Amino acid sequence: MKYNVMFFGTPEIAKIVLETLFNMPEVNLIGVVSQPDSHFDRKKNVVYSPVKQFCLDHDIKLFQPQKIKEIEEEIRSLAPDIIITCAFGQFINQGIIDIPKYKIVNVHASLLPKLRGGAPIHYAILNGDLQTGITLMHTIKKMDAGNILFQRSLAINEQTTTKILTLELANLGALMIKEHFLELVKSDLVGIQQDENDVSFAYNIQKNQNIIDFNKPAFFVNRFVNAMYDKPIAIMEYNDVLIKVHQIKITNQKSTQKPGTIAISKHQIFVSTQDFNVELLLIQLPNKKPLAPKALLNGKNPFSN
């Protein structure tokens, strides 16, 4: 038996879940809803989201409303049996929540009730959590507060970046949808209520929240850079130049200078923190490609002033 399925999502993590649904024999993918185009390249050409590009490549019916409520009647006319969502980026109104027979199931990238919100992967790393995971949950009007249906965890280490963890969680979420789909399309699936006493939040990273604070200990600075990679990427300011910091390494050198002080040794760049120096391994000047310090220091750069 095939089930009529709609999918709501936008970024790469959502595309991987969508691709799995598209290839499942029990799924009839009747439509996808994604955020409106909002990214442009240097030539001001529109850059399609991963989900939109997948839909265009596979001739899938796509909706991009400014607000999801605008297409409520179109969704109703498609009569989805179930709606799957992942990193969609809009609140879903009650009218749409009530449409599918088997409800809306959200693929959320945390072990709920921890880290409700739009940036759970960033904050799992920022918080120094030892594990995170995927929660399949029923969507209700309150953000990420619906009943937990299935959960599975993944380990996090000090080298884990948001880019790496996003891919791992995307693959895990896709696998869980594949394994549990026939259970999700059962009317008697209720799940477990979330414990409101254990709730924490992971709101979207805002502008200027990606600036490195070298007054923090080195372990936190390293964690921060990992959490911001590869979006939005951590930044530091030096000689009035904003520098993107892609990768650093904690050294065993005790910091003897004021936090944020730069020291250059041959082809290496070090920055002092609250306790230990960190070494910049991959950095990027404005409108340039990311470079290792050895290559960057050979040319014109803010560190030679």
Swiss-Prot record:
Stated family: Belongs to the Fmt family.
Q: Briefly state the protein's biological role.
A: Attaches a formyl group to the free amino group of methionyl-tRNA(fMet). The formyl group appears to play a dual role in the initiator identity of N-formylmethionyl-tRNA by promoting its recognition by IF2 and preventing the misappropriation of this tRNA by the elongation apparatus.
Keyword line: Protein biosynthesis, Transferase
Q: Note whether Zinc-finger occurs among the keywords.
A: no
- Organism lineage string: Bacteria, Bacillati, Mycoplasmatota, Mycoplasmoidales, Mycoplasmoidaceae
* The species this protein was found in: Ureaplasma urealyticum serovar 10 (strain ATCC 33699 / Western)
* HAMAP family per the UniProt record, alphabetical: Formyl_trans
Locate the residues binding (6S)-5,6,7,8-tetrahydrofolate.
S110, L111, L112, P113
Q: Which PANTHER family match?
A: METHIONYL-TRNA FORMYLTRANSFERASE (PTHR11138), METHIONYL-TRNA FORMYLTRANSFERASE, MITOCHONDRIAL (PTHR11138:SF5)
What's the protein called, per UniProt? Methionyl-tRNA formyltransferase
Stated EC number for the protein is 2.1.2.9
Per its record, the protein catalyses:
L-methionyl-tRNA(fMet) + (6R)-10-formyltetrahydrofolate = N-formyl-L-methionyl-tRNA(fMet) + (6S)-5,6,7,8-tetrahydrofolate + H(+)
An MF annotation (GO) of this entry: methionyl-tRNA formyltransferase activity
